[in-house]
Amino acid sequence: MAGNSIGQHFRVTTFGESHGIALGCIVDGCPPGLTISEADLQVDLDRRRPGTSRYTTQRREPDEVKILSGVFEGKTTGTSIGLLIENTDQRSKDYSDIKDKFRPGHADYTYHQKYGVRDYRGGGRSSARETAMRVAAGAIAKKYLQQEFGIEVRAYLSQMGEVAIDKVDWNEIENNDFFCPDVDKVAAFDELIRELKKEGDSIGAKIQVVATGVPVGLGEPVFDRLDADIAHALMSINAVKGVEIGDGFDVVRQKGSQHRDPLTPQGFRSNHSGGILGGISSGQDIVANIALKPTSSITVPGETIDVNGEPTELITKGRHDPCVGIRAVPIAEAMLAIVLMDHLLRHRGQNQGVVTTTPKI
């Protein structure tokens, strides 16, 4: 199975399934000398892990990460960093009724047709459980970016169903279970989730992820443009069906005189581009939005077929999120951090000595 790695200079490879023994990843390319510990990684893992909120799945996994290699006496050695998280709360019996059926809206049918075999327990490799390792690897990238370059990567839930935020207060995000920056919308999110649970249904969501302090010059045109790699990374997150950079699809309604970001000696007057011009970071904030579909793991009966192609009906059992967008916030942060880390190392390797007479704004 290909497609388990991302990045060139900072490369992350994950392995494991939802109901397997453990999840793991190998992080290659992290520079030596970075002070890092399991506790550093655990902070973001605790933000993502299941069973911590009444609004998400009640599968209770501690998600305690173990650093197996690449760190000695609290500092990275420059060699491969091995990370492992054991699965401890699998309930595979919840999926025995669907082992010969394809859950509509999931990867069951496509995995079966591609590989000829599938792990039906919780979706196997296609489960969002895999993203725990992305978050662990992303925590390494986030710490390096912050410590060495002053770059900060943060995200928040901006919309759930028809409920959208009206304001952004970064200080509010960690004060509620929704990662919501608008305290006035928390009650509406709560009411929506309660109603969905009664109905046995789910809802989609939108997340904004922002990186501040990114220097000008990151990105490798033409095929490894920074925005292309960011879109690739964010699109790889489970349930993501759309990615926007900057104003995204709103540019369709804009005129050139409105969309362009005027330059002044003091800096840019606007940031419609989302901090990227020509595939290269402009020095402004990197801004991206992702849209996540509503999960199909719901108790509302749905049509499907079995492995013999016969029609049947399916009701999903198990423990699932009524809105997968809530726990996707730290995942989005991790993926953006991994891309920025990779491009910083690539840029430093080729362009570190580049000097221009034009001042940076």
From Swiss-Prot:
It is an enzyme of class 4 (lyase). Coiled coil: none annotated. Its cofactor is FMNH2. InterPro entries: Chorismate_synth, Chorismate_synth_AroC_sf, Chorismate_synthase_CS. It comes from the Bacteria. Reduced FMN (FMNH(2)). GO terms for molecular function: chorismate synthase activity; FMN binding. Keywords: Amino-acid biosynthesis, Aromatic amino acid biosynthesis, FAD, Flavoprotein, FMN, Lyase, NADP. GO terms for biological process: amino acid biosynthetic process; aromatic amino acid family biosynthetic process; chorismate biosynthetic process. PROSITE patterns: CHORISMATE_SYNTHASE_1 (PS00787), CHORISMATE_SYNTHASE_2 (PS00788), CHORISMATE_SYNTHASE_3 (PS00789). FMN binds at residues 125-127, 238-239, 278, 293-297, 319. NADP(+) binds at residues 48, 54. GO terms for cellular component: cytosol. Its EC number is 4.2.3.5. Pathway: Metabolic intermediate biosynthesis; chorismate biosynthesis; chorismate from D-erythrose 4-phosphate and phosphoenolpyruvate: step 7/7. NCBIfam families: aroC, PRK05382.1. This reaction introduces a second double bond into the aromatic ring system. Homotetramer. This is Chorismate synthase. It comes from Vibrio cholerae serotype O1 (strain ATCC 39315 / El Tor Inaba N16961). The gene is aroC.
